[in-house]
Structure formats: C-alpha cells, structure tokens
Amino acid sequence: MSRTAWRTVQWALVIVVIAFVARRVINQWGELSALPLSVTASPSLLAASVAAVLASYAVLIWTWQHTVVAWGERLAFGDAARIWFVSNLGRYVPGKVWQIGAMGVMAERAGVSPVAAVGSSLVIAIVNVIAGIAVAVPLGAGQALGSSLVIPVAAGLSLAVLAAPWLLPVAARGAGRLLRRDMRIPALPHRAVWVAAVGCGVAWVLYGVAFRCLHVALLGRATGDLGGSTAAFTASYLVGFLALFAPGGIGVREWALGPLLEQFGIAAGAEATLIVLASRLWLTIIEILPGLAFLLLRRPGQRTHSTPSA
C-alpha cells in the first residue's frame, strides 16, 4: 500500500471514530446531566486517575515492544507508542480485529517483519485477556464465590498463566477460525510470554487504581476497596472487549459494570449510574486523544528495515 493510500485509510478511520465517539459522548453527557445528583469532582483525584491509565498504557506498550524484540526484531519505544495509540482507534470500529490488523500493518511499515508484526499483536491480545481474568477472578472471588474459593481459584489461574506459552497456539487457531484466516504463532521464548503476562497483569492493576481514583473523585468519599474496584473494572472491560459486535465495548461494558459496582459495595442506584456513564466518557477520551495526537503531530519519515537484535 502506498504512503498516500495508507494515510487516506488512517484518516478515514479517524473520521469514523470521531463521528461515532462524538455521538456517544453527546448522548451520555445528556444522560449524566439528567441524573438527580450534584457532583463536585476532585481535580487531583481525576488527574491521578488519568495518570494511572497513562502509566498502564506505558506498561502495555513496553510489554508489546518486548514481545517484538523476542522475535529478533527492533522497534523503538517511541515508534511502539505511536503504533499502539493509533491502532487503538480501531477498537471503535465494529469487529475488534481492526485494532490487531492495524497494529500489524503499522509495525510492518516501521520495519518489523510481517510474522513478528502480526504475531506479537495477537500474542499481546490473547495474553492480555488471560492476565485480566487472572487479576479479576481472584480479587472478586472473595465476595462473588466465597473466601474459601479464593486460593483454589488463584492457584488455577496462576497455572493458566504459566501454561500460556502452550495455550497460545491453541488460542491462535481458535482466533484463526473466527477470523477465517491462518493465524499461526511461531515459536516464542517462554520467558517472553511470561513477561508479557506479568506486564499485562500490572497494567490491569493500574487500571484498577485509576478507576478507584475516578469513582472516589466523583462520589466524594471512598467506597468498597481497591480489590473490588480492580475486579469490577477489569471484568466489565473484558466483557466489552470480547463482545466483537460492540465498538470499544460500549454498551456491553456498561451493562456489566453496573451490577458489579453494587456487588462490590462501590455504588448503587443513581450513584452507580453516574460512575458507569462517567467512566465511559473518561475512558473513551483517554483512549482516543493520544491516537489522534500522534496522527496530527506525526512527522513524515522513511520506512526503516529491521535487523535481528544481538
């Protein structure tokens, strides 16, 4: 694909995303305004929530970059960040595969081999889901399943994470059947997969910290605990992510989050609705602004060719 054609595709994606998100923001802002609540959010806690999300992005970007390097490729962190944020806009196009596909194409254009470009994107997507489940279930098991099940559940999920290097090829074949294309993952050092799992797990915890800062800022008081906040956010995010028909998980994530807020003692009624709607606006803005900024501020550059790392 020529440079001009690729830029056209990118800007077409931007237009679709902005139109979709703008409509959702307008609708949800109206719903927020109609709530029978007086909200005076803490600016410092809101800033802390944004900082925690950006920190989780930094961890995820480093994790993906590390996976690319494990394939014997080279990719600078700045290039990895640009690819990550711009391709993230594809989450707001129905089908979810746009994000993984865009990440692979952009990495290849940055000089990464096609196998490593697509393979690393798929690895991170799969490992991120496994790590998210491994974070959400133990944290929520105490209240959802009973404290006696926390240790067995945590042990089982830990084994699943350790088995990730062997589970990935199976998951890739399943993804291939879903996408109707050959999705084979070449051999990857087990250590690289485990590092990816740890990185994704840390990112989920940072997401939980960010979400807790947000709902404490909105309510003006601390409710629930950090474990419940992390479990509620992670579980609802994964439900939205796995709903292929929902762009950005919008609608599905909110449907899942509401009951979890009440279950973990965070909020109920109008306050739960406030957190659900505000968190969608908060997350949408944080997800799309960096990608748009990278597109607008990107300086023309030549395509580089990767060489195996020493």
Where do the protein language model's features map onto the residues?
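Hydrophobic alpha-helical segments and helix pairs
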Residues: P114-A141, A155
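Mid-bilayer segments of alpha-helical transmembrane spans in multi-pass integral membrane proteins
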Residues: N88-V97, A125-I133
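Membrane-interface alpha-helices at helix entry/exit sites of multi-pass transporters
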Residues: F77-R82, Q99-I100, E108-A125, A267-A278
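Transmembrane alpha-helix interface/packing and boundary motifs in multi-pass membrane proteins
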Residues: V86-V93, T234-E254
